[in-house]
Swiss-Prot record:
It comes from Scheffersomyces stipitis (strain ATCC 58785 / CBS 6054 / NBRC 10063 / NRRL Y-11545). Disulfide bonds: none annotated. Signal peptide: none annotated. Keywords: Hydrolase, Membrane, Metal-binding, Metalloprotease, Mitochondrion, Mitochondrion inner membrane, Protease. This is Mitochondrial inner membrane protease ATP23. The gene is ATP23.
Length: 240
């Protein structure tokens, strides 16, 4: 969908839920189709649909997120493996993560999750579409926790930030080849895994307030790429 000239991006704080007749039946189907195709959709309508969608499905999304989280904490090989290694690095060898600080909530941005050293892990319920996507996101954030404990990551050092982002995208499974083929087709097959990791790392570093721009982020990622891409700890190798 092409940009609308001089369009004003709506402020989500000024939106309210549409009338009930617009949230079900044929009208909801029509709006959903319009959103997917972008045909005849202006920025205001796009923002309104996204607002309505989150309102319509948020309780279901939050419940699903909690259900998926609990399942992964018990049965996911990558999640339980990372949790065990985080416990080994924790003070007094006690588990510092549990259901009280791995939380599901609503996020305003497009991220699937986040980690804060004092608060724990956030899983963005309104951005998670499946159990397996949550597994990737949770594993990604657990790699950040592991790196924080083992390497004392300082996010004010862009090289530190780049390295933990490279490792998290590499080890979480979110850049597995099948995912990339679905997104970008079969072209450059042999480079898809590394390209995905670099792309994600550059985006994350670009969002760091001390990073000037994406060009600086790319330079930093490239400068630490070799050492960080080859560091699969605590895994013996990349298996997801």
């Amino acid at each position: 969908m092409s940009a609308v000239p001089n369009a004003v991006i709506p402020n989500p704080d000024n939106l309210s839920v549409s009338a009930p007749e617009k949230l079900s039946g044929f009208e909801w189907w029509r709006r959903s189709l319009q959103y997917r195709t972008g045909m005849g959709l202006d920025p205001q309508e796009k923002a309104q649909f996204e607002f309505d969608y989150q309102h319509k499905y948020l309780p279901q999304q939050c419940n699903s997120c909690i259900e998926f989280r609990d399942w992964m904490l018990t049965y996911s090989p990558s999640v339980t493996f990372m949790m065990d290694h985080i416990k080994k690095l924790s003070p007094n060898k006690e588990q510092i993560l549990n259901k009280s600080n791995i939380i599901c909530d609503v996020c305003d941005d497009l991220k699937g999750g986040g980690f804060h050293p004092q608060e724990g892990i956030l899983l963005c319920a309104n951005r998670i579409q499946s159990k397996w996507q949550l597994e990737d996101i949770l594993t990604h954030e657990l790699v950040h926790v592991y790196d924080h404990l083992k390497f004392q990551v300082n996010l004010n050092d862009l090289k530190h930030h780049a390295c933990t982002e490279i490792r998290a995208s590499m080890l979480s499974g979110e850049c597995r080849i099948f995912n990339e083929i679905k997104k970008t087709g079969l072209g450059d097959f042999g480079k898809k895994f590394q390209s995905c990791i670099k792309r994600r790392a550059i985006l994350s570093v670009s969002a760091n307030p001390i990073c000037k721009d994406s060009e600086e982020a790319e330079k930093v990622v490239n400068s630490v790429w070799q050492s960080c891409f080859n560091d699969t700890r605590p895994f013996e190798r990349v298996y997801r």
